[in-house]
C-alpha cells in the first residue's frame, strides 16, 4: 500500500513541517509534485477551492490547483488535515488539527470520532457553558460569505430570515456582528431592510 503525502498542498512552511512529521510517524512517502501522483492513500493539508483560471491567480493558488487535481483524479482514500474547529486561536499556527477521511467537512467526511472518549476534548480545557435563555440581547455572528462551512447557503438571506424569526419570538435587542473578512456586509443588509431599533 502506497501512502503519499502531498507536501505542496500547503504553501505554509509550518504546515509542510507538520506533514513531514506525519509522514515520518507512519513511514509514508512525501512528494513535492505540483500534480497528482497515483497512490492508495493521498494525504493533503487544507480545503480545496475552485479557482479562477487567470495565470496570476493560478500561481498564487498553486496549492489549490494541486488539491483540485488530487480530488478529481484520486480513486483511493484521501486524508485531509484542516484547521481545528475547537479551541481555535486567531493565528496561522495551531496546536491541533481536524483530520477527515475523504473530506474536511461535517456530513462529507468520516472523522472516525463515533463513540470517542472525552479525554481529547477535556484536554483542551474548554469550559462549556449552559445555554443562556436570559439577558439583554441576542448576538448573531456572521461567517465569511464564501466559507465552505456554509454549504452554499446565501448568508444574507439566512440573516434576514433569522432576524425576522427572532423579532417574532423575543423582545430582546438583536446585535449582528460580521466576520472580519466581510468588512461591514451584513451590517449593510441590516441597514437596507430598515429593521426596528431593536436590531443593530
Model-derived features: positions:
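Flexible, charged surface loops at secondary-structure boundaries
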Residues: 1, 33-42, 71-75, 130-135, ...
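Catalytic donor nucleotide-activated moiety binding site of glycosyltransferases and closely related
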Residues: 6-10, 160-200
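Short, well-ordered secondary-structure micro-motifs within conserved domains or adaptor modules
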Residues: 33-66, 71-72, 77-79
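A nucleotide-sugar donor-handling region in carbohydrate enzymes
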Residues: 76, 81-153
Amino acid at each position: 500500500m502506497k501512502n503519499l503525502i502531498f507536501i505542496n498542498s500547503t504553501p505554509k512552511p509550518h504546515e509542510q513541517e507538520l506533514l513531514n512529521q506525519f509522514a515520518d510517524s507512519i513511514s509514508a512517502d512525501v512528494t513535492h509534485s505540483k500534480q497528482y501522483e497515483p497512490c492508495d492513500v493521498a494525504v493533503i493539508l487544507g480545503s480545496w477551492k475552485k479557482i479562477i483560471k487567470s495565470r496570476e491567480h493560478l500561481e498564487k493558488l498553486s496549492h489549490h490547483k494541486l488539491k483540485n487535481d488530487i480530488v478529481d483524479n484520486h480513486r483511493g482514500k484521501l486524508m485531509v488535515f484542516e484547521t481545528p474547529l475547537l479551541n481555535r486561536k486567531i493565528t496561522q499556527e495551531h496546536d491541533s488539527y481536524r483530520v477527515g477521511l475523504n473530506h474536511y467537512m461535517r456530513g462529507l467526511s468520516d472523522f472516525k470520532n463515533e463513540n470517542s472518549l472525552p479525554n481529547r476534548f477535556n484536554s483542551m480545557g474548554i469550559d462549556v457553558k449552559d445555554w443562556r435563555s436570559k439577558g439583554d440581547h441576542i448576538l448573531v455572528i456572521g461567517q465569511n460569505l464564501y466559507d465552505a462551512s456554509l454549504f452554499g447557503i446565501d448568508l444574507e438571506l439566512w440573516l434576514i430570515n433569522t432576524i425576522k424569526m427572532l423579532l417574532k419570538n423575543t423582545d430582546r435587542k438583536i446585535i449582528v456582528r460580521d466576520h472580519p473578512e466581510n468588512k461591514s456586509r451584513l451590517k449593510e443588509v441590516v441597514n437596507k431592510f430598515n429593521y426596528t431599533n431593536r436590531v443593530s
